[in-house]
From Swiss-Prot:
Organism: Cebus capucinus
GO cellular component, one term: extracellular region
Native organism taxonomy: Eukaryota, Metazoa, Chordata, Craniata, Vertebrata
GO biological process: defense response to Gram-positive bacterium
Protein name: Inactive ribonuclease-like protein 9
Glycosylation sites: 130, 142
Family, per entry: Belongs to the pancreatic ribonuclease family.
Subcellular localization, as worded in the UniProt entry: Secreted
First-listed, main subcellular location of the protein, grouped into a coarse class: secreted
Length: 205
């Protein structure tokens, strides 16, 4: 049985990053042409977190933009969307595949404003989340097969709904910033509903 060492795994990740522009340069727009890490600082930040044995580093604006937000290009309904984007953006937890993830087609400023919206229940019913006031397009990724990273396999589900997020205080910016994406809630079908101030769907009489 061949053992995959940390050194060989990192070399594999580097190779995949170099190959991606060649594989997708004719298929999609600019966001899908260049490797995810466009400068040395971004890549070094990824390597430190990847090799760390301690807790996950706190989120930053650039990290949220890099791992969660996407630009127009590859169709959001593509069945291979998550497999490609997870690998391209290096969305892993240490040496493991993440069990689920969300990609959102929106600007960072709009997502950050959501941190100041009213609290609503999260999908787990425990923590408090903030809900966007507008519908957001995105993709929900659900892990179906876990192997040695980066060869994680996902089902991709297109969604258009209200995004639920948790936020945290960022000392350097002196602002609340997005921390995790909890859910992308699709509005009820075949009803003319709207959100009240408490973030609850209401159907007019």
């Amino acid at each position: 049985m061949m053992l995959i060492t940390t050194h060989s795994l990192l070399l594999l990740l580097l190779l995949l990053q170099l190959l991606q522009p060649l594989q997708f340069q004719e298929a999609y727009y600019e966001d899908f042409y260049f490797p995810a890490y466009r400068d040395k600082e971004d890549f070094e930040d990824f390597m430190v977190e990847f090799q760390s044995t301690g807790p996950t580093r706190p989120p930053t604006k650039e990290k949220v933009k890099r791992r969660i937000l996407v630009n127009p290009g590859m169709p959001l309904g593509d069945s291979g969307y998550c497999n490609y984007q997870i690998m391209r953006k290096n969305v892993y937890y240490k040496y493991s595949c993440v069990t689920e993830h969300y990609f959102l087609l929106m600007q960072y400023d709009e997502l950050q404003k959501t941190c100041y919206n009213r609290f609503v229940p999260c999908k787990n019913g425990i923590r408090k989340c903030n809900m966007s006031k507008k519908l957001v397009e995105g993709v929900y990724c659900n892990l179906t097969k876990a192997s040695n990273i980066p060869l994680c396999q996902y089902n991709s589900f297109y969604r258009r709904g209200y995004v639920l997020i948790t936020c945290t205080w960022q000392n350097e910016m002196q602002k609340l910033i997005p921390y995790t994406i909890n859910d992308l809630v699709e509005p009820p079908e075949h009803t003319k509903s709207f959100l009240n101030e408490d973030g609850v769907f209401v159907v007019p009489p």
